[in-house]
Amino acid sequence: MVSRVLYRPFDTEDFDAIALILRQLWHNNSDNDEYNRLEAACDLAYCLSSSTFSQVAVIDGEARGIALARAGQNSGVTINEHWMDTERALLSQMRELEPDACAEYLSFVRATIRTNNRLLEKSPLPHDNEVTLLAVDRDVHGLGVGTVLLDAAVSHLSSLGATRAHLYTDSNCSWKFYELHGFKRTATHRANREERRHDMPRESFLYELDLTA
């Protein structure tokens, strides 16, 4: 039974718990559990390096969900560099442990970036004001944690004067959740055969939220 839910900014002590959530959700393709752990941690470090806002859900003293967002390019230089360095160090460990799996992961990341850029080109949206990550432990789904985290990220962007927010998701994720919270799909990309070879989802989506409504 949940006795307490606390929402606060990300703390470095949350890193391992949040990375475990990402690992369980998206980073479990390798038979090597240690590699999966490193890959999830690398993904989280990347997201932290490109974000200027964080909110973590702490339930009974344990981090169980996170939202990250990016508003402009004018803050977080020091912490961004820290997480970029962390990402590089983790990539080095991944290459040493499982070079083939690491190469495939990097191919996937590059394909994802290309896809996201194509999606954004189809929309008049600015490149800033993005919800960069939303992840919630499966064990606490249905408790409203994701809703509170998403609302916190969107409210932060709005408080800085943003009139629109956007995010990327895909057919492997719970995209209907965003529609229930007012986001509208503005662009779709269907993966070609080469992209599918790199484990890209069948469809990738750009979602937009009007913050003036």
What do these predicted regions represent?
Residues T132-H141, H166-K176, A191-E195:
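Conserved beta-strand-loop-alpha-helix junction that forms the acyl-donor binding cleft
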Residues D33-I59, R64, L68, A89-S92, ...:
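Active-site rim helix/loop that mediates acceptor-substrate recognition in acyltransferases
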Residues D128-N129, L157-D170:
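Conserved GNAT acetyl-CoA-binding A-motif
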Residues T147, S171-T188:
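Conserved active-site alpha-helix within GNAT-family acetyltransferase domains
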